[in-house]
Amino acid sequence: MKSSAIRQSFLDFFASKGHTVVPSSSLVPGNDPTLLFTNAGMVQFKDVFTGQDTRPYSRAVSSQRCVRAGGKHNDLENVGYTARHHTFFEMLGNFSFGDYFKQDAIKYAWEYLTTVLKLPSEKLWVTVYAEDDEAYDIWHNDVGVPKARIVRIGDNKGARYASDNFWAMGDTGPCGPCTEIFYDHGPDVAGGPPGSPDEDGDRYIEIWNNVFMQFNRDEAGTMHPLPKPSVDTGMGLERISAVMQHVHSNYEIDLFQALIAAAARETNTHDLGNNSLKVIADHIRACSFLIVDGVIPGNEGRGYVLRRIIRRAIRHGYKLGARAAFFHRIVPDLGIAMGEAYPELVKAQTRVMDILRQEEERFFETIEHGMGILESELKKLVAGGVFDGELAFKLHDTYGFPLDLTADICREAGVAVDTAAFDAAMARQKAQARGAGKFKLGAGLDYAGEATTFHGYDTLAREASVLALYKDGSAVGELKEGDSGVVVLDHTPFYAESGGQVGDRGTLQSKQGAFEVEDTLKIQAQVFGHHGVVKTGSLAVGDSVLARVDETARARTMRNHSVTHLMHKALREVLGEHVQQKGSLVDSEKTRFDFVQPSPMTAAQIREVEARVNAEILVNTPTQARVMGIEDAQKTGAMMLFGEKYGDEVRVLDIGSSRELCGGTHVARTGDIGLFKIVSESGVAAGVRRVEAITGDNALAYLQAREQEIQQAAAALKAHPAELGAKLAQTLDHVRALEKDLERLKSKLAASAGDELVAQAADINGVKVLAARLDGIDAKGLRETADKLRDKLKSCALVLGTVADGKVSLIAAVTPDVTAKIKAGELVNVVAAQVGGKGGGKPDLAMAGGTDPGALPAALASVEAWVQSRLS
């Protein structure tokens, strides 16, 4: 039975039992900022289990894409070396939200395994929590499992309710016992039943876990029965596929065999049992689906985990002999294997391949050098030795080797890595980076007062009272003239930095003094900190102030923020729906927008985006902002940022034909933007491009400056601006013709100089020796002259030098019959050392440079004596 058929049969079975089939959620959890990746089927239902969310159904079934790599659940180092460890896997699960409980959950599991999949019942073992008599009785009395195949598992992890068969979401909250189902591979495989001393063997393999959430644990550890007990189950598709296909390793199932064959094809490997092929086959799934779900290789967070997985795959390909990008070419094979179940993979195939290829090409530039350093160091160590942590950090910092990749290679050689030294080197680098960065006061301030009420959508000036003052991070009662600090107000028109938009600046004016606001940041979610300096007088807690935003800066920022929405929509229309925002910065000067895009934008695409945005501006439609519930916002079709966590209420912004969620400040009508111009487009990471654009008076000033430059260039070329291109092409043709004439003249000059120099050559033991300075000649001319002199002098050793821009250039040439005694590299370095330089090359030709032109005459004069010493 193929993996795809098992997946579908599971969904169909539970659908027939009244379950709603719920699609797999993203690998990037949208409702849990503490979780790096979705690692279980229940993640998308977590808020339902905790009562923070409701669904229109009480029974659900899903096949959830999961990743375990990085953080608490990290299987990376075992992948490829064991039968069942993966970075990516699919979790089949059925869920009850206060509907059915143990009785039906157990019966459903048994019916699916024995009736649908037709597994022999005598091959199945079960475990229950030692105190869960209810589950035990259901298994034995209702299902009919013999007592000999039901194992009670107690608290085996050193604490009350700390057991393999007791599940908890955390130290507090929903929890409960679980029952696990095991498959017996038979006596030919080593290992004992669950709960026995030999349970870690491979004979008895867990295939399904049913968690019964029936308690809520409080901070005192007391268990309170939940009013609506729930069920959360999980069965790995790869494990049950191995059972159904009568193989012992997950890597032997149909899905993996296709990917292993593809990896072997791309690395030209004939041994299909090689562990490196298993690594590559596993990693292509994790990497491809992470990119599909919006993760881009980077240097932190999820992006760095993705980069580590990609580079681990590349390293295993390198180990198999690959010396160029190969990994991305396996993506189409993955599409064939899994595209029917996950059509989003096929839809994004080109983008996935492009991002992987770029990441591969980048790492292949450094992997050979890095591997050379690593392998050289390993040769010095014996098994059981320790690899230098400082060197591991150098491999990480200079050659892009993640620590776990270095550790992986060392592990194969029986060597450990000094991770403490690595961590210390990393900490030093981070400390230096922090020291070089700009420090901003903000979230660290200790404030426990009332919240700030924001009025900045409607007004730019507002009376307010000072609630708190801070100086050097500590609360104070007063700020005096010249003091820098932070002011907290009860009301404010100042927008605090959020959503990529910078904080407002302006003034706080009281009877006692004036405070210049340089920036506005959130100290807490609803508490605004006004950062700045007292310009005159003083400011005290309790003072009444007039808070006034800098109107010009705010207007420019609003134009730039509003146009970002229009640009985002235009980018998706011109480049494709794969465009997703990866970051933004909006201030009074520009908007900077980072987005998913595998290749640079063409000039035509940039012009098209500009045209679409400016067309929206010309229509001059009104902007509308509405506050509504998150579900209502979703129904409107408003665009939401991928992976962003939103509250129950959100602000939906309609501007032009764009509709997005946004809490920033915006223009009243699109026409207020005035003018839009993209000023730069560049790459910031593999698969991520950056556009910078300007609006309004800034855009006008930019275009006027470019126009002035064109007029000045036209005047210099004595041409009309409209004819500048043709005139420039004509001028360049003329320059190229002159350059060719110059090259011919230089060659003649070099030949003439060569003829004169032949007569200056000294004869030492039958070898012509020449050392001379040539002026007005470049490096190319120097070499041509040396070649001609060598031909004319026959048996010779010569050095020529020239000076340009305060730098010395040298060349040494030696005929083949002389290289046994005189090497050109040695000869040129004798001279170079005297002029403050060094060089190198072949035995018959070498070049060098120097920094001391004044020493050149004496250095050249020393050549004859040195040659004499080598020939005598």
Swiss-Prot record:
Alphabetized PROSITE patterns for the sequence: AA_TRNA_LIGASE_II_ALA
Lineage top rank: taxon: Bacteria
Reaction catalysis annotation: tRNA(Ala) + L-alanine + ATP = L-alanyl-tRNA(Ala) + AMP + diphosphate
Organism: Thiobacillus denitrificans (strain ATCC 25259 / T1)
Subcellular locations according to the entry: Cytoplasm
Upper lineage: Bacteria, Pseudomonadati, Pseudomonadota, Betaproteobacteria, Nitrosomonadales
Protein name: Alanine--tRNA ligase
The protein's Enzyme Commission number: 6.1.1.7
Described purpose of this protein according to its UniProt entry: Catalyzes the attachment of alanine to tRNA(Ala) in a two-step reaction: alanine is first activated by ATP to form Ala-AMP and then transferred to the acceptor end of tRNA(Ala). Also edits incorrectly charged Ser-tRNA(Ala) and Gly-tRNA(Ala) via its editing domain.
Recorded name of the encoding gene: alaS
SMART domains named among the record's database cross-references: tRNA_SAD (SM00863)
Disulfide bond annotation, renumbered to this chain: none
Cellular component, GO, one term: cytosol
Family: Belongs to the class-II aminoacyl-tRNA synthetase family.
Residue sites binding Zn(2+) per the record: 561, 565, 662, 666
